[in-house]
Curated annotation (Swiss-Prot):
Gene: cybc1
Purpose: Functions as a chaperone necessary for a stable expression of the CYBA and CYBB subunits of the cytochrome b-245 heterodimer.
Family of the protein in this entry: Belongs to the CYBC1 family.
Domain of life of the native organism: Eukaryota
The keyword Membrane belongs to this UniProt entry's keyword annotation: yes
Protein name stated in the entry: Cytochrome b-245 chaperone 1 homolog
InterPro entries: Cybc1
Organism name: Xenopus laevis
Membrane spanning stretches: 20-42
């Protein structure tokens, strides 16, 4: 699952993403290796502690982040937040959270981008495109294989931000200006 709609009202869209089952399975697998090495080893308790701590460190490093996106029409802002247990441990609970705040009126388009994920193939992520020309992904990691899930979230986000209405209006304005310029050329 790419992102789940936590709540949706007329003025608020709250999207959330938790670590995937693959990520949790990897965590359990790596921790199991450390525990098995400690259990079956004839080394001292200090080495056994090192095995478990080392594997726990690697397991937490490979755990995906918790990601959240809140689009609020009342405040006119989108807040993209990323939480990481690994960063929290490294900074001794002072960090572990990255936050990006964007004005909703700056978002021009919402697209699904394809990313190459090493060893696994293709992944998909939603990209927010701004009027300044800058692009920013909605999440830090791509989801593997399920393009339809990502497109459904992108469609929901486009509908909430009313970007499809903006496109329709701009196309209508372009067509009317084209027909006016054609009419002016015909008169000459």
């Amino acid at each position: 699952m790419y992102m789940q709609v936590e709540s949706r009202t007329g003025t608020l869209l709250h999207l959330k993403r938790n670590p995937s089952i693959r990520s949790w399975s990897l965590l359990v697998g790596i921790l199991s290796v450390g525990l098995a090495a400690a259990y079956y080893s004839t080394d001292t308790w200090l080495w056994k502690l090192f095995y478990v701590a080392g594997c726990a460190f690697v397991a937490l490093q490979n755990l995906e982040d918790w990601e959240e996106a809140v689009f609020d029409k009342k405040s006119g802002k989108a807040i993209l937040t990323t939480y990481s247990i690994y960063k929290k441990l490294l900074t001794l609970c002072k960090g572990g959270q990255d936050q990006v705040v964007v004005l909703l009126k700056e978002i021009r388009d919402v697209n699904v981008a394809e990313e190459r994920v090493r060893y696994f193939g293709k992944g998909y992520v939603i990209v927010l495109r701004f009027v300044t020309g800058i692009s920013h992904p909605l999440t830090q990691s791509a989801v593997l294989g399920a393009r339809s899930d990502v497109e459904a979230v992108a469609k929901e986000l486009t509908k909430f931000l009313e970007l499809d209405l903006v496109r329709t209006r701009s196309q209508a304005v372009e067509e009317s200006s084209d027909s006016e310029s054609d009419g002016a050329l015909d008169k000459q």
